[in-house]
Amino acid sequence: ESALKSGVHLLYYSFPKSAKETSDGFEVEITGKSIEKKVFARRVIDCTGNAAFVAMAGYRRIKGSEIQPGTLDFKFSNYNPEKIDKAALSAAYAEALKSGELHPHELWKNINGLIAGGGKGAQHLVGADSSDAFVQTDSNIRGREAFLRLFRFLKRQKGLERIKISYV
């Protein structure tokens, strides 16, 4: 509200394709949902999440020593939580963590919370990076590998043999 009242022009669902600094601002080529347009801006607030505009404008990006992990949301279905032995599932999960098959950051809830909560969960992908398409692709592949490890682990557990992926 404040931004709009102050004369800021917002454009959601778009991202910079190129940026060139001029003597009185920035010439920006943007692309997004059904648009491709060149605009001029006196000032730009880079909200890309990966400082894409900063890099395109020719400035150096500074990456902190710690970056926010990526998040992969998912949901499992086709099981009855009432028929799951929680103690056995917890023990199997603890063993999978101990053996290195699974990693603690790969499941936002505890294993029984995931099952009791209707199968909705999330994984934190430590080291996920979106600074360019190549490293973001690598991050996405690693995230899906972690998700599949969890899915395959669950399918081996009594009462979860027919579990299905509703969405990722």
What are these regions (language model features)?
Residues G7-V8, V28, I45:
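Hydrophobic aliphatic residue packing
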Residues Y12-Y13, E36-R43, C47-V168:
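Flavin (FAD/FMN)-binding glycine-rich loop and adjacent Rossmann-like elements that form
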Residues A19-K20, G70:
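Short secondary-structure capping/turn micro-motifs that flank functional sites
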Residues K20-K38:
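Conserved beta-strand-loop-beta-strand element in the redox core of flavoprotein oxidoreductases
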